[in-house]
Amino acid sequence: MALLSAMKLQGRPPPISSNLNPNSKPAGSDSVSLNASEPGSERKPRKFSSQLNRWNRARTLRSGAKLDSTITNGSNNTTGPMRPIESSSRTDVSTLDSDVSSSSNGVSEADMTAAKSIYIVSDGTGWTAEHAVNAALGQFDYCLVDRGCPVNTHLFSGIEDGEKLMEIIKQAAREGAMVIYTLADPSMAEATMRACKLWKIPSLDILGPITESISSHLGTNPSGLSRGITNSSLNEDYFKRIEAIEFTIKHDDGALPENLEKADIVLVGVSRTGKTPLSTYLAQKGYKVSNVPIVNGVDLPKTLFEIDPRKVFGLMINPLVLQGIREARAKSLGLGSSFKTKYSELGSVKEELELAKKIFAENPTWPVIEVTESAIEETAAVVLRLYDERQSNRAMPRISKSY
């Protein structure tokens, strides 16, 4: 008890076992073990690096590779996706109730509160649910990192068998996890909802309400087939994405300027404004993208000013941020001091950005997007919104013309 009190005062939950086997011993046995070594030998909480910002730390915690792990299984940390337990072949919800209730007694209250888990279950790739969960967790970074309430997410994809589904839900009940699911098969979704309600598991169906609303709006029933699984047929969209990716790779960093007319989107900006990763992201959505660098002393290709201006987008960034990015880039490449001065010196950076502003001012039909504090996904969303508006000759209402 004294040891537990000391650990609570330090703000650290006691270590717990990750053994979730239905036959695990009750609390108080070997399934929950406390370190009874001398206080001086206790592991001190790891201090976070000043180089690691809150967002990255939170994502590290959510991925399961915790910065200060408290969940142990023997001597090994539990990392990576968890797998369903192999204990029962029964799939009926009502007959599994007693099994879960009896085995959950082997997990103590401390086990349930030390770390929170979210199970993501999908009959496809799980991409939709996983990204929705990560987006929502982004609202809790202040708690996940600084207030010591880490959350682990575990993805179970390709779950099309009722037996496997029930095993996952049983495991979630034992661990006290939340279940978030996208199951296209109505019977699977219904079974999940009933099981979670029976065992008092917090759960959320991401796909169901949206599908029902669209079904009502269209006046037709959904197919109930999952999308994005590995054995899905290769359709036109798949080959369109492959073609777009191949095109984008070949036309990176100003290559083959004679083909700019063939691109759906053309990105223009100075070095290290994120043109290449943004191009790749857009290509994965099926858009052929070329990007053209703005460099002092190098003329832009004439074809850039001859193509449809509705497909051209400029990228702008804060000079201090750009300088930091370039310094890190030069250091990683082991470049000489003379190149570093020309490439990452603040005066040179500002000079290039002034040149970019001048070019953008001379071409007012090109939207200029500020990328300093934007993630690739956020910038891509702005590009695609503007692209759609310009291609369809319609403008969506917006609060500001600042992108």
Curated annotation (Swiss-Prot):
Changing S279A: No effect on phosphotransferase and kinase activities. It is an enzyme of class 2 (transferase). Expressed in green tissues. Changing R272M: Weak interaction with PPDK, and loss of phosphotransferase and kinase activities. It catalyses: N(tele)-phospho-L-histidyl/L-threonyl-[pyruvate, phosphate dikinase] + ADP = N(tele)-phospho-L-histidyl/O-phospho-L-threonyl-[pyruvate, phosphate dikinase] + AMP + H(+); N(tele)-phospho-L-histidyl/O-phospho-L-threonyl-[pyruvate, phosphate dikinase] + phosphate + H(+) = N(tele)-phospho-L-histidyl/L-threonyl-[pyruvate, phosphate dikinase] + diphosphate. Changing S271A: No effect on the interaction with PPDK, but loss of phosphotransferase activity and partially reduced kinase activity. GO terms for molecular function: ATP binding; phosphoprotein phosphatase activity; phosphotransferase activity, phosphate group as acceptor; protein kinase activity; protein serine/threonine kinase activity. Changing Y238F: No effect on phosphotransferase and kinase activities. Residues 1-108 are annotated as: Disordered. Interacts with PPDK1. The initial 51 amino acids are sufficient to act as a chloroplast transit peptide and the removal of the next 35 amino acids reduces the strength of interaction with PPDK significantly, which suggested that these residues are important for binding RP1 and may not be part of the transit peptide. Bifunctional serine/threonine kinase and phosphorylase involved in the dark/light-mediated regulation of PPDK by catalyzing its phosphorylation/dephosphorylation. Dark/light-induced changes in stromal concentrations of the competing ADP and Pi substrates govern the direction of the reaction. In the dark, phosphorylates the catalytic intermediate of PPDK (PPDK-HisP), inactivating it. Light exposure induces the phosphorolysis reaction that reactivates PPDK. Belongs to the pyruvate, phosphate/water dikinase regulatory protein family. PDRP subfamily. This is Pyruvate, phosphate dikinase regulatory protein 1, chloroplastic.
